[in-house]
């Protein structure tokens, strides 16, 4: 009876140790495992894939593609435009989820890319609608600036002082 009990105890402890090893998870940051945002009316959990053996989707794995269009881009896209990293983006998504109406997160990928995935909690405004050099209609661009961003046109210039972040 003692051996049976001891073997059972060892088995249970090994299960608990294994469960504990998996429970630690693959966090986003040391103090951030995940966040929940609302996307198109549904709650979405943002977290890293918990499988440490996971590989990048082959559709995103190419490292050598013709430039243009697949050119390396600067981290600072234009003067006055703030560049942020993934953790800062998650902070903005959390603020938006908590009701901060000054935050607007835009996924600027084109529709064919958005079909493959998007930023949960964002709205899609393709970069082609935001860039005059890509053929964006100036009137549609002005409408986006005013209605989506909250910018104010003043004597031919745009005032972003009260625009969404």
Tell me the role of every PLM-derived stretch.
Residues 22-117:
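Flexible, polar/low-complexity N-terminal or interdomain linker segments that lie immediately upstream
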Residues 140-165:
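Catalytic cysteine-centered active loop of the rhodanese-like fold, especially the PTP/DSP P-loop
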Residues 132-142:
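Short, charged, surface-exposed secondary-structure boundary motifs
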Residues 18-20:
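N-terminal signal peptide c-region/cleavage motif recognized by signal peptidases
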Residues 125:
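Hydrophobic residues at beta-strand termini and immediately following loops
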Residues 3-15:
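Sec-dependent signal peptide recognition
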């Amino acid at each position: 009876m003692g051996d049976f009990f001891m073997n059972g105890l060892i088995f249970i402890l090994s299960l608990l140790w294994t469960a504990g090893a998996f429970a630690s998870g693959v966090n986003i940051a040391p103090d951030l495992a995940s966040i929940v945002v609302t996307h198109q009316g549904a709650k979405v959990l943002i977290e890293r894939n918990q499988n440490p053996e996971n590989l990048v989707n082959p559709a995103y794995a190419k490292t050598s593609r013709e430039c243009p269009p697949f050119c390396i881009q600067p981290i600072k896209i234009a003067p006055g435009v703030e560049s942020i990293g993934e953790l800062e983006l998650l902070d903005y998504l959390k603020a938006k989820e908590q009701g901060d109406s000054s935050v607007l997160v835009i996924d600027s990928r084109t529709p064919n890319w958005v079909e493959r995935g998007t930023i949960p909690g964002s709205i899609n405004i393709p970069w082609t609608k935001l860039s005059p050099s890509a053929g964006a209609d100036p009137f549609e661009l002005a409408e986006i600036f005013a209605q989506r961003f909250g910018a104010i046109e003043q004597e031919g210039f745009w005032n972003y002082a009260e625009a969404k972040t």
